Amino acid sequence: MSMKEKDIVQEPPCSSQSLNNYLWKDKPDEDKWADCVHCGMCLEACPTYEITGQEQHSPRGRVHLIKSVADGKLEVNEQFMDPVFACLDCKACTTACPADVDVGGLIEEARGQIRQAMPLTGWRGAVSKFFLHGLFPHPGRLQSAGNLLKLYQKSGVQTAVRKTGLLKIMPEHLATMETVMPKVKQSVRKKYNKEEVVKAKGETKNEVAFLVGCVMDVMFSDINDSTVNVLTRNGNDVAIPKKQTCCGALHVHAGDRDMGRKLAKQNIEAFGHTDTVVANAAGCGCMLTEYPELFREEETEWRERAEEFAAKVVDVSKYLHDSGYEKPKAEINTKLTYHDACHLAHGQGVRQEPRELLLDIPGVEMVPMPNADRCCGSAGIYNITNPEMADGVLESKMENVPEEVEMISMGNPGCMLQMAMGVEKYGRNQKIVHTIQLLDWAYQKEDKQRGQT
């Protein structure tokens, strides 16, 4: 018997049974790093390693750090925190890993330990608590914030701010973000507030429940509207549960796993009576499928409910592709390329379905993007908390966008905002669109040509 075979037979999956310096609940899962042999196949897939060239900013290096804390060789301190929070959590390393090591899961669990050991204090703690606890989980407050932003955009204040040069005193990345901020429109929650179910146009074939999201329904409500239009056109009754809330992705990414669990429980309850939960935001959909990870150390009931719920979740592009959809007849004459959102391609394994939806629209010519599944640098709010690294990742991404295309299509709002910033920053002129928007536009054009309203 070889040494390798002997180790496999005699050694347990992990040897650090006490997880020595992880002193708080919800500890990193040893089984996630058990199969990592530090082969390095993840290195080329990692955007932060590409930029820094530093081992601690590679997936392999981060796994080593996380295991070192478990082995008692390293404390949960600044030295540990910096590389863990510098990770984009894009999951490209797991796709590249021949052993499917879930580095992203380890990162999120390690962040949970860090935030229990080193809570944010001062103004950072206050800002974090305001957004993560006081705003995102509360649709009414988010709608009020959206109304204020809408007033800012329509009252002339935004124009005055831009003309007077006030944006110049803001950090560059925030000023650019303000420049490309989408126009706030009526939310889908408000539009269909009096309807339990938005009925299918024509014969009802299926019923689905739609996660409208938190920021998504305020900042990108037009995409939500397009999603409802496309689903109902294709024979789906669309339920919009009123008690649904934020998916919790931003909380889990920030290390606030307790709040993540609270939001997960609320969504599991809200969507409890449906067989299919459709999401149109890659980050939100991926988070919903990962709810079981939040209940790994919890009581059996919630763990099982989370697993049942996660199995119901599907991205809208995959749902339409798999359930069948009406191919539009009207032409949208455009040359476009497609960007794979990390949490759609790497997180949910959805790659070909949105491309096929786009290619089924007459007049669409698709130009392949090199490294289409490379992160754009958005990563939730990473482009706000780590602007320099995010800008480096974005620069690399924009170098791969074909010059000749008129549109860049994708399936995640954070990516849309980040790529719009890239278009602005690098003097490009491409229009940023969600895949479902383009399909909706084709349907609308077809109806107009038929003389329908």
Each language-model region and where it sits:
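Non-heme iron-sulfur electron-transfer modules
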Residues: 2-25, 49-82, 100-130, 429-438
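Iron-sulfur cluster-binding electron-transfer modules in prokaryotic oxidoreductases
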Residues: 103-453
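Cysteine-centered iron-sulfur cluster-binding motifs in ferredoxin-type domains/subunits
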Residues: 30-49, 77, 81-101, 343, ...
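Short, intrinsically disordered, charge-biased short linear motifs at domain edges
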Residues: 20-33, 73-84, 199, 232-234, ...
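N-terminal glycine-rich anion-binding loops that anchor highly charged ligand groups
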Residues: 41-44, 55-58, 237-240
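Alpha-helix capping and helix-loop boundary segments enriched in small/acidic/polar residues
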Residues: 34, 53-57, 75, 251-258
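Short His/Asp/Glu-rich catalytic/ion-coordination signatures at enzyme active sites or charged loops
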Residues: 71, 92, 96, 255
